[in-house]
Amino acid sequence: MSEALLLGAVLTDGGYAKRIAAATGSHFASAERQYRYPLELGSTRPPQSQWTVTGAGSAIVARGGEGPSLTCGTVGKVIDFGVSDANNMGAAMAPAAADTILAHLRDTSRPPEYYDLILTGDLGALGSRLVEDLLAERGVDIAANHVDCGEVVYAPAEDEFQGGSGAGCSATVLNAYILAKMRRGGGIRRVLFVATGALLSTVTSGQGDTIPCIAHAVAIEADGVPQQGGDA
């Protein structure tokens, strides 16, 4: 979702488009069948696994408007931490999220406290703790204002192991919940949105190859004004 927002912002800011729909989604059964085990097989799930969200989200990026603004972004790089377990995506993606957050804060000279919310997704409970630990090792503490989409998309009573995953996880949480709170003035004015992704295929996961991952960050500010125009 963050990649779509970044591309949409670049295209509208450059004058190549007036309005762009940034959208993505995921489906639980499709992800299980392709990357893990068919549901009909009835396989048990390990405790480190997450449940792919069946959902989709879309945001309109335009040169003008009254919505929160996309003020800056950081394109991530591929990080392979050597994790090969397709049931442990949080651990695989956490290093990429940590690297992008660190690069963003360094490039913008901003402390973590600049943002009311640092929203990652979709690391789940395990990956969320890992990204906080990895950044703490580099002297950056985000624990006070960090929330992961995978942790909050399901209610605790649903017992979805480590939480949600999939492209639809961060898309639904951002568009249906966070942006709505920003528009209503719910105490959230500045958000660093860091969606995470795994660059694996059905073949590589079946062969036991390691899972390279990437994360992109985009700053969304309710009171921000883009330097060259372009509201979200």
Model-predicted segments: where are they?
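Active-site-proximal alpha-helical scaffold in enzymes
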Residues: M1-A22, V61, S165-G186
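A generic, well-ordered mixed alpha/beta core segment in the N-terminal half of proteins
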Residues: M1-Q50
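Acidic, glycine-rich active-site loops and adjacent beta-strand->loop/helix elements
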Residues: T24-R33, G76, A195-L200, G224
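Internal helix-turn-beta structural module
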Residues: A171, Y177-Q207
